[in-house]
Amino acid sequence: MNVLSCSINTLKGLYDISGVEVGQHFYWQIGDFQVHGQVLITSWVVIAILLGSATLAVRNPQTIPTGGQNFFEYVLEFIRDMSKTQIGEEYGPWVPFIGTMFLFIFVSNWSGALLPWKIIQLPHGELAAPTNDINTTVALALLTSVAYFYAGLTKRGLSYFGKYIQPTPILLPINILEDFTKPLSLSFRLFGNILADELVVVVLVSLVPSVVPIPVMFLGLFTSGIQALIFATLAAAYIGESMEGHH
């Protein structure tokens, strides 16, 4: 009976943890609108980290880069190569967009594991990685959708919409549906992976607080980086596809 009681208490504790992480949110009331305060706070922190790091790295640029400048130049080369591979020779104007997406998602994902969000107490809910919230991932996916529609229209004009009846007009509904499922798949993939990673770490910390969570956290950091790379790569691929006019 004691074992059963302990098991029930443990499950209740895990349920409470999950409820706090997923179900409760902190809002700001601005007029008649409710603004999701948790996401804005953590997003501003991530943006500040990116801007601060970039400023420190390039405040005294050298002809032969060292330290932070060398690291940021390596990251820029990586993003340029990825953009060129997915978009083609006209990748140049899209490097800032793809780079911003990659760096924001990468730092957001890592912030969930490395920054002590939990020590900041809110009236409701808890702070976590921005990408832990579906609002952030959907917004990023919608930005990607706007980007590839813009790329297609500026490159091909109104003939861009001809792709919806290729190779046959019968496929018009499916081709339209495809453009709606692209942002959905991007947003839910990123949201699900980051949320699941943070919940697993929280549960393991509550059960075995000293040893087991450490390798899981390292695995989470690895998968978080992979998710940022996947999102940025697919965003670049969609932009390249819209400019080329084929699937």
Curated annotation (Swiss-Prot):
Membrane topology according to the record: Multi-pass membrane protein
Compartments where located: Plastid, Chloroplast thylakoid membrane
SUPFAM superfamilies: F1F0 ATP synthase subunit A (SSF81336)
GO cellular component labels: chloroplast thylakoid membrane; plasma membrane; proton-transporting ATP synthase complex
Coiled coil regions, renumbered to chain: none
InterPro entries: ATP_syn_F0_a_bact/chloroplast, ATP_synth_F0_asu, ATP_synth_F0_asu_AS, F0_ATP_A_sf
Quaternary assembly: F-type ATPases have 2 components, CF(1) - the catalytic core - and CF(0) - the membrane proton channel. CF(1) has five subunits: alpha(3), beta(3), gamma(1), delta(1), epsilon(1). CF(0) has four main subunits: a, b, b' and c.
Its job: Key component of the proton channel; it plays a direct role in the translocation of protons across the membrane.
NCBIfam families: ATP_synt_6_or_A
Protein name in the entry: ATP synthase subunit a, chloroplastic
Phylogenetic classification of the source organism: Eukaryota, Viridiplantae, Streptophyta, Embryophyta, Tracheophyta
Gene for this chain: atpI
